[in-house]
């Protein structure tokens, strides 16, 4: 099958979900698309990317040949997994170029693709969610999809400011107290249980964190205000998405518009759902 006949669509992601630092991720219904450039032709709204783009680096590192284009609605540097989605798209596009355009072949290779994407990204939470879809738990090279008994709306409050994940991570402590570690382990377990049983009453306490969120919010007063505003509504829960500055809010679809109206006007609000498909070849 010719290169011109396929492209890859990959969802954005929200990492950590509060306590699940570097382990939990959620795929979201805003997407990045990538495909090979053939005869210099790219689709409307797309752009050819240079060798420094994370998607191009991933494509070449996995054996892809030629140039690639990208078309994306995922905000960059906002905590919605743009770089992770680009890296997943790059390795999946290279795999399709080498092994054929088949989602069955893609599914069979997901563990290897996860490993390649994680090596490039440095942590698995975003890339696992973007590759597999749904809510994912990943560690030690393995990933599982968390069964969901909920069909929530996810509001993403997205300000104009950007955050460098690398710089944000350097601000975090290299050691933890035993009590903080125990709280986060317990909350992560509680969160997985609440999502899989549909017990929304547990979600607020289950998304509380003691490892990274307060440290990051101390340098992001706008995000802190958005998180506080979200938690003053009847939203089920809210968390700092990845390293921020985006704040993710989980709620019932029927409450989404009312909750969105109460978030600070210093950011845009995207009304999203959980993407259940992950990376797909089209």
Show the residue positions of the predicted features:
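Active-site rim beta-loop-alpha module in soluble metabolic enzymes
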Residues: 156-218
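Glycine-rich, charge-dense phosphate/pyrophosphate-binding loop(s)
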Residues: 195-282
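Gly/Ser-rich oxyanion-binding loop with an adjacent helix/lid
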Residues: 64-145
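Solvent-exposed alpha-helices and their adjacent loops that cap or buttress functional pockets
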Residues: 2, 14-16, 25-28, 79, ...
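Glycine-rich beta-alpha junction loops
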Residues: 12, 30, 134, 158-163, ...
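Short beta-strand-to-turn element immediately C-terminal to the catalytic PLP-Schiff-base lysine
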Residues: 36-37, 130-140, 248-252, 282
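Short beta-strand segments
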Residues: 9-11, 27, 130-133, 139, ...
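ATP-binding N-lobe of GHMP and related small-molecule kinases
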Residues: 1-78, 95-109, 272-277, 281-282
């Amino acid at each position: 099958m010719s290169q011109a006949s396929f492209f890859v669509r990959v969802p954005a992601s929200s990492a950590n979900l509060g306590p699940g630092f570097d382990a939990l991720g959620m795929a979201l219904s805003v997407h990045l698309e990538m495909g090979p450039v053939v005869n210099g032709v790219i689709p409307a709204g797309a752009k050819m990317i240079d060798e420094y783009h994370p998607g191009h680096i991933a494509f070449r590192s996995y054996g892809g040949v030629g140039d690639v284009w990208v078309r994306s609605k995922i905000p960059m540097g906002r905590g919605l997994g743009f770089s992770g989605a680009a890296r997943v798209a790059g390795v999946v596009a290279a795999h399709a170029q080498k092994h054929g355009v088949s989602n069955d072949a893609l599914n069979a290779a997901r563990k290897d693709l996860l490993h390649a994407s994680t090596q490039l990204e440095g942590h698995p939470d975003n890339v696992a969610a973007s590759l597999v879809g749904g809510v994912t738990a990943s560690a030690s090279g393995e990933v599982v999809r968390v069964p969901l008994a909920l069909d929530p709306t996810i509001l993403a409050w997205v300000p104009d400011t950007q955050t460098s994940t690398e710089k944000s991570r350097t601000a975090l402590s290299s050691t933890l107290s035993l009590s903080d570690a125990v709280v986060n382990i317990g909350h992560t377990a509680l969160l997985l249980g609440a999502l899989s049983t549909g017990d929304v009453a547990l979600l607020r306490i289950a998304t509380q964190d003691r490892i990274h969120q307060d440290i990051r919010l101390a340098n992001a007063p706008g995000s802190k205000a958005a998180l506080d505003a979200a938690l003053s509504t009847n939203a089920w829960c809210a968390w700092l998405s990845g390293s921020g500055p985006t704040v993710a809010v989980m709620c019932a679809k029927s409450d989404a518009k009312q909750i969105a109206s109460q978030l600070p006007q210093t950011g845009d609000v995207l009304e999203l759902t959980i993407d259940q498909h992950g990376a797909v070849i089209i």
